[in-house]
Amino acid sequence: MKILITGFDPFGGEKINPAIEAVKKLPDEIDGHQIIKLEVPTIFYESARVVKNAIEKYQPDMVINVGQAGGRAAITPERIAINFQSGSTPDNSGKGPKEGKIEADGADGYFTQLPIKKMVTATRKAGVPSEISNSAGNYVCNHLFYELQYMRVHEFPNLKTGFIHIPFLPSQVKNGRHPSMSLSYMVKGLTASIKAAVDA
């Protein structure tokens, strides 16, 4: 099995994004399954185009997107992607989309194909905090999550896709105002979560 794991580049004035930093540290194989790592831009629509190109190139069986969720204290697999985006916060292009639906003919929401309960259990057993999230927000994370689900329905019916949010790194947190997690713990937790997903 081939698993494509993506991580976003830094955004919002940050110099680092734990998503791509953790993805880069993942092993090249997990339980004999090939791990393909990809950095994606924090840009509406462009992020989905980059991932689609990678799907067509590598033909993965599963795609897991990883993103930063500042304020969370655990690794959080997402349950559902919603057909809504807000352009109130500019992306890395300096712009944002018109507020509204991501895809005019898309479903209001798509549930992940990943075994998120098993993923949470496995991550906790590895000693890393984890819980299911029911909201991926309305920024580029949810946008990419939704677009991948939309592609699965219309173009890649055998593909399994999902999204995992991770906390800030300690270096991103000032005055201890937000939770954070070390990079080594993120990698440990993501590895356990991915292993549970591919072994389900």
Curated annotation (Swiss-Prot):
For this UniProt record, the keywords arranged alphabetically read as follows: Cytoplasm, Hydrolase, Protease, Thiol protease
InterPro entries documented for this protein: Peptidase_C15 (IPR000816), Peptidase_C15-like (IPR016125), Peptidase_C15-like_sf (IPR036440), PGP-I_bact-type (IPR029762), PGPEP1_Cys_AS (IPR033694), PGPEP1_Glu_AS (IPR033693)
| A Pfam family assignment | Peptidase_C15
* CDD domains in alphabetical order: Peptidase_C15
Please name the catalytic residues of this protein.
Answer: E78, C141, H165
| Gene Ontology CC terms, in alphabetical order | cytosol
Q: Name one GO molecular function term.
A: pyroglutamyl-peptidase activity
The reaction(s) catalysed by this protein are:
Release of an N-terminal pyroglutamyl group from a polypeptide, the second amino acid generally not being Pro
Query: Which GO biological-process labels does this protein carry?
Result: proteolysis
Q: What is its EC number?
A: 3.4.19.3
Task: Give its localization.
Answer: Cytoplasm
User: Key word Hydrolase present in the record?
Assistant: yes
Report the PANTHER family cross-referenced here. Answer: PROTEASE FAMILY C15 PYROGLUTAMYL-PEPTIDASE I-RELATED, PYROGLUTAMYL-PEPTIDASE I
Q: Known NCBIfam families for this protein?
A: PRK13197.1, pyro_pdase
User: Subunit structure, per the record?
Assistant: Homotetramer.
The function of this protein is:
Removes 5-oxoproline from various penultimate amino acid residues except L-proline.
Record's HAMAP family? Answer: Pyrrolid_peptidase
Tell me the protein family, please: Belongs to the peptidase C15 family.
- State what protein this is by name: Pyrrolidone-carboxylate peptidase
